[in-house]
């Protein structure tokens, strides 16, 4: 299948698959051409033969394939053992995240899985060049999928620790290193996966470890637009001036002054929902309402 500019990796995953339209998030019908697609009301997004159905599968297995190549070859690469341990840990983190996201998108929820007995995903953990006849794999169970996620993250966390390095040490000269995983990122993915698996004690443990050095943002930062990493931002999509995702950047769609907003493709919240917020509710300040720009007496 051909995936065009609409499909640009994690930006697309967050925009089309990570946000489910509802009263708090909706593309109004005045948004020309985009509303049915973005609101998941189009037959295009509902069809099992659609590229919108297959793209996450293609995208995450592409990451898994790259991760397998790193895991398989890193020991023979040049560099210190500490650097190689860290890079292998990153590859394991990416692979665990990808298996987890595939399970979220293509598998039954854990609550309906008969304790993980339903179908999981294909667990490709060998590089194709090394797999031989093992390339034609069957689906795992959902329990086996989550076990692989846990195993990858356990090994990643072990390697992060023995390396003694952080992403600041490895990517010290990068414009931004927020997109590169390290131990806190692995803990965060572990927490999300465990929460989705209803493994609540494990989720609580790893969530605390993930957040340890990421204090919550203050009110001013909360209202600053979410366009740059804040103190509580653990992991994010790579972006700098030389490598952007152009038309499908999150803020191009979501920001009130973004490109698509200027083309009358605005994201909105249901009026009844936003008016139900108390004036003291910090979320209310994120939305433009009549009271935002009209005099209190309602005159124009």
Regions found by a protein language model. Name each.
Residues 6-12, 17, 38, 162, ...:
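Hydrophobic-face positions in mid-chain alpha helices that act as interaction patches
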Residues 31-107, 136, 140, 158-161:
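Conserved, well-structured interaction surfaces
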Residues 103-110, 164, 196-198:
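Short coil/turn linking the two alpha-helices of tandem helical-hairpin repeats
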Residues 154, 160, 183-184, 189-217:
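Aromatic-residue-lined binding/catalytic grooves and analogous aromatic/hydrophobic interfacial grooves
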């Amino acid at each position: 299948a051909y995936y065009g500019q609409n499909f640009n990796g994690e930006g697309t995953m967050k925009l089309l698959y990570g946000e489910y339209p509802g009263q708090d998030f909706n593309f109004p019908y005045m948004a020309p051409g985009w509303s049915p697609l973005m609101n998941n009301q189009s037959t295009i997004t509902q069809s099992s033969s659609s590229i919108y159905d297959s793209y996450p599968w293609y995208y995450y297995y592409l990451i898994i394939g790259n991760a397998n190549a790193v895991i398989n070859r890193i020991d023979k690469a040049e560099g210190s053992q500490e650097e190689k341990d860290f890079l292998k840990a990153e590859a394991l983190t990416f692979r665990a995240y990808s298996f987890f996201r595939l399970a979220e998108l293509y598998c039954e929820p854990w609550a309906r899985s008969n304790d993980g007995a339903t179908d999981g995903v294909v667990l490709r953990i060998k590089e194709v060049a090394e797999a031989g006849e093992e390339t034609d794999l069957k689906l795992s169970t959902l329990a086996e999928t989550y076990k692989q996620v846990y195993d990858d993250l356990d090994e990643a966390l072990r390697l992060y620790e023995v390396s003694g390095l952080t992403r600041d040490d490895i990517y010290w000269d990068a414009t931004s290193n927020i997109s590169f995983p390290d131990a806190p990122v692995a803990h965060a993915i572990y927490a999300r996966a465990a929460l989705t698996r209803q493994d609540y004690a494990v989720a609580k443990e790893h969530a605390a470890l993930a957040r340890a050095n990421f204090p919550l943002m203050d009110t001013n930062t909360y209202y600053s637009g979410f366009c740059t990493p804040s103190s509580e931002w653990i992991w994010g999509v790579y972006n700098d001036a030389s490598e952007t995702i152009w038309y499908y950047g999150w803020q191009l769609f979501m920001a009130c002054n973004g490109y698509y907003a200027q083309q009358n493709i605005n994201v909105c919240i249901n009026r009844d929902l936003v008016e139900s917020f108390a004036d003291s509710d910090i979320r209310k300040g994120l939305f433009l309402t009549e009271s935002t720009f009209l005099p209190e007496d309602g005159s124009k």
